């Protein structure tokens, strides 16, 4: 008998639906009172401790989720990914970001070819180049050392590397290696982003890394041309070859741009943009800033989770457990959002990166076979570090909509602070909140408890907390390069698990394309109106035509053929 076309047609899905009502009637106060249950919902791998006991789930729920995973052929799908099968079916590609952090002697194949030697060829090239820049043997056009780097890219070429960079900035080893150096990321085509990136920098000491697989990404290439003009206007056109390098596979366009093809670093079609931080996209700028040795530890951390994900049984498998619980929260309990709440300022860019990884991967409305999904999938991801978020949006999480939360804590701070006479040190103050918030969400506060505290009758409705709000807690021993790699890989694989269970393609992003094609029409209109004075055509709807006309009229002082003008900011 053929497998059902949709996971929602399986017996395991229907069983979970039937199981749902009993769980909804059981409060987390009751579930948390079962010590045996709580112990069964704690998992440890490599000193990473996961506690999912504050999920609205019983041991029976978890067993039923394992059955759902079996009916979704989760293990087989994971194996197919690692084996290089073309699981990105709409683009007919392998999905092998795990190969980017595999040890040199590994064998991971795509289309019958072991891709690991190619990966390490690029990594060796990055190490050699970054070492030469850092030790001063590669210098700029005027003989000065290149101390500042601007990485130009957008989407996955920006968010992932920015997350890792921000996380490493205050790590003792990484910060020591980065002393006297600066790394910036230029992503938005908004000229304000250009101005902010070049502010305070000297073209003589700046190296630009242009990240575009095809070297045709509209926003990235306009920003790259802008920085090329910034460099050449100060140092002459010939300086571009010494001050700009590329991460791309389109060597003819790289050379045409003015960059020596020998200074181009490759990556491959089997690397999706949002999964590319472990390729030259992230490794090159991060190695220039922190040295290759630090970045290699980051890759090793990610690889440790890759091994764990591919080999650990589901009941001990952190990404699998997290992915299954997300499916439970989204598709059964009906919670559309998730808050990522790291109690470490170093992880402040984790949520924006995972927002892209998750929402671009699983923001789909059809199955891999093109069938409309009759259930909710995908999550709205957001977050801020604690305790900042507590003074921002936690109000809604406590007393408004139910939003499952990921609390991430670190045992040892990157930068400990102790003040004589204080009740606790700074990190303990932070962690006090990390431990308290999940319980506040789970237990809440009842009217009866408030009455015992002699709270005024008219305030009781306002001070009542319903509780029963799910969360997971992850406790990391430290936050160094290795652990940062582990955090990245846990979330990458969690997203894949969700997509595998839902039966969607988590590795394409056709939703990005429609807006791009419509922007081409607008770009053509803006050019025609600026240069030839053409009125806005009838091809636009009334609303867009009105907005475009208003914009053009208000910016009529923009010259049709302007002289080059670069941002003027000190």
Curated annotation (Swiss-Prot):
Originating organism: Clarkia rostrata
Official protein name in the record: Glucose-6-phosphate isomerase, cytosolic 1
Pathway membership: Carbohydrate degradation; glycolysis; D-glyceraldehyde 3-phosphate and glycerone phosphate from D-glucose: step 2/4
Entry's localization field: Cytoplasm
Family stated for the protein in its record: Belongs to the GPI family.
Gene name of the record: PGIC1
PANTHER family with a match to the protein in the record: GLUCOSE-6-PHOSPHATE ISOMERASE (PTHR11469:SF1)
Keywords: Cytoplasm, Gluconeogenesis, Glycolysis, Isomerase
UniProt xrefs under InterPro entries: G6P_Isomerase, G6P_Isomerase_C, Phosphoglucose_isomerase_CS, SIS_dom_sf, SIS_PGI_1, SIS_PGI_2
